[in-house]
Amino acid sequence: MATVKVRDVVFGAGAPKICVPMVGRTLDQLVNETEVLKVLDFDLAEWRVDFFEHVEDIEEVKSALFEIRARLGEKPLLFTFRSKREGGQREVSDDYYGALNKALAQTGEIDLVDVELFQEQSVVRELVDTAHEHGVKVVMSSHDFARTPVKEEILMRLCRMQELGADLPKIAVMPQNASDVLVLLDATNTMREHFADRPFITMSMSGLGGVTRLAGEVFGSALTFGSAVEASAPGQINAADLRNILNLLHMQT
């Protein structure tokens, strides 16, 4: 399987990389979050722009991005607008979703962009092309906050993301019981052994799925999310604790 390098971070080699989301609603809150990140051990930051109060003004988003980028130094930055139907804070039109992500990919200030698999397919294809034209990696994602699909469905979505040009396919699902967590882990292992030609990301959410955020090196997931100020999804573990646990598990593998 190939690796994916973003700045100095290599996905698909060694322990899962740690991504810390920034979820500030105002620019001041975002600036405060970047100050907290300065003392954390993590690999990349994610700006969850759907939390931002001015998210429907592209110029305001760009202005905030320039401030964030300047404060993050050489840490890679993932830009994410999470739609409400996939667990985010708000819904926008397909046209605006495409325009926002395209405009930010063209700034040269982000390293990765999240593209939801189930957005309008013409929008998905255009965003993948635009991102790659500007040297931006694509995290293509699917989130199910209601259930855990069957193993075959999880594999189908991840393989479809590869076909569409995702650099890092990603799926997050909600478990109802321990068996659901095992379904996600089994799918992850099967993806790694039989279908993946690039790093990918999987997780089972909530406290019940917490083990999947820790076991990526064993089963095949290349990235995990840890919280700093506020979690962006159920089950996220504090980033400092996450690093300690991942390091311990890495020494045993």
UniProtKB/Swiss-Prot annotation:
The keyword Lyase applies. Pathway: Metabolic intermediate biosynthesis; chorismate biosynthesis; chorismate from D-erythrose 4-phosphate and phosphoenolpyruvate: step 3/7. Its EC number is 4.2.1.10. It catalyses: 3-dehydroquinate = 3-dehydroshikimate + H2O. InterPro entries: Aldolase_TIM, DHquinase_I, Type-I_3-dehydroquinase. Involved in the third step of the chorismate pathway, which leads to the biosynthesis of aromatic amino acids. Catalyzes the cis-dehydration of 3-dehydroquinate (DHQ) and introduces the first double bond of the aromatic ring to yield 3-dehydroshikimate. The gene is aroD. It comes from Syntrophotalea carbinolica (strain DSM 2380 / NBRC 103641 / GraBd1). This is 3-dehydroquinate dehydratase. GO terms for biological process: 3,4-dihydroxybenzoate biosynthetic process; amino acid biosynthetic process; aromatic amino acid family biosynthetic process; chorismate biosynthetic process. Belongs to the type-I 3-dehydroquinase family. Homodimer. 3-dehydroquinate binds at E46, W47, R48, R82, R213, S232, Q236. The active site is at H143 (proton donor/acceptor), K170 (schiff-base intermediate with substrate). Keywords: Amino-acid biosynthesis, Aromatic amino acid biosynthesis, Lyase, Schiff base. GO terms for molecular function: 3-dehydroquinate dehydratase activity. The lineage of its organism: Bacteria, Pseudomonadati, Thermodesulfobacteriota, Desulfuromonadia, Desulfuromonadales.
